[in-house]
């Protein structure tokens, strides 16, 4: 680049943050601190992510129960998301209540809508995978927009994801919130116990098997996020299902003093569960 006009050269330096190392050389060696590039790219990426989130939110639902004699009649404690044909929902197994008040016709289902404009859709349990903390529901009514389950084996440590759900369930109402998370590690599901007295029956059972791998995330999730889709911010493809957080001390501190460490079940286990609907 041969710049003869010093004014033009100075203007270029001011605009692009260019440091010229040798003004006598025909081809200048330059060091560019050009923030203009990030200004151009940033908003485009932000717009793409915003569009992805809006698309995904249409498939994210609350998972809970309905009981006419109860106030409020609708109650949800976790999150789920629509997959496959628009009639199936993936969530965590621990979100599904083990006992229903059948005497008062309590029903499992999903909650859709936003804010005060909500609708309850009854659902039935199609399949459940307690080992991987997953459940598959089938809803009635019209189909809803479905998300695609990706190959979680392709996920890499350091990859950025986002997840959408209802962090505190009913406490914040039916307002979907989205959070960033980085895949910090792919680790065995059984976390080491420094004290053998802290091992429970479930942990011992897992240790006797070959522990499957789980996604450890550098991101803050809350109890109501259980069942939230963990997805690619550009494509919306789901690679995991949020299922637990690392708790420091008592369970209550998961809300008041979150550790910032969350976990997700790889989506391949959800894909396996989905295949059971046709068996």
Regions found by a protein language model. Name each.
Residues 28-39:
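Bacterial N-terminal signal peptides
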Residues 1-25:
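N-terminal secretory signal peptides that target proteins for export/translocation
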Residues 104-110, 115-123, 157-162, 176-200:
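Beta-strand/loop subdomains of soluble extracytoplasmic proteins
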Residues 92-94, 166, 235, 244:
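Short, surface-exposed secondary-structure boundary micro-motifs
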Residues 44-82, 88-93, 132-134, 156, ...:
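N-terminal activation segment of mature serine protease catalytic domains
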Residues 56-73, 139-148, 177-275:
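Active-site region of chymotrypsin-like
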Residues 51-52, 99, 124-126, 140-175:
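Active-site substrate-binding loop(s) of clan PA
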Residues 84-130:
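Catalytic-histidine neighborhood of serine endopeptidases
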């Amino acid at each position: 680049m041969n710049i003869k006009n010093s004014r033009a050269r100075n203007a270029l330096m001011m605009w692009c943050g260019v440091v010229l190392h040798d003004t006598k050389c025909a081809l200048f060696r330059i060091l560019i601190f050009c923030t203009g590039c990030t200004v151009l790219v940033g908003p485009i990426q932000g717009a793409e992510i915003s569009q992805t989130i809006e698309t995904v939110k249409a498939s994210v639902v609350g998972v809970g129960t309905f009981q006419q004699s109860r106030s409020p009649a609708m109650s949800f404690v976790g999150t789920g998301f629509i997959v496959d044909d628009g009639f199936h929902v993936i969530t965590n197994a621990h979100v599904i209540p083990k006992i229903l008040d059948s005497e008062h016709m309590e029903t499992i289902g999903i909650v859709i809508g936003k804010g005060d404009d909500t609708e309850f859709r009854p659902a039935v349990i199609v399949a459940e995978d307690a080992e991987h903390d997953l459940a598959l529901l089938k809803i009635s009514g019209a189909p809803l927009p479905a998300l695609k389950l990706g190959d979680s084996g392709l996920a890499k440590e350091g990859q950025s994801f986002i997840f959408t759900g209802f962090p505190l369930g009913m406490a914040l109402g039916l307002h979907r919130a989205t959070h960033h998370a980085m895949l910090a590690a792919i680790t065995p599901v059984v976390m080491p116990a420094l004290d053998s007295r802290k091992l429970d029956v479930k942990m011992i059972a897992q240790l006797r098997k070959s522990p499957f791998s789980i996604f450890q995330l550098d991101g803050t999730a809350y109890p109501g996020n259980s069942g939230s889709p963990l997805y690619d911010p550009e494509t919306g493809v789901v690679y995991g299902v949020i299922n637990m957080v690392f708790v420091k001390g008592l369970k209550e501190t998961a809300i008041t003093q979150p550790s910032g460490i969350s976990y997700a079940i790889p989506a391949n286990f959800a894909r396996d569960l989905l295949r059971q609907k046709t068996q």
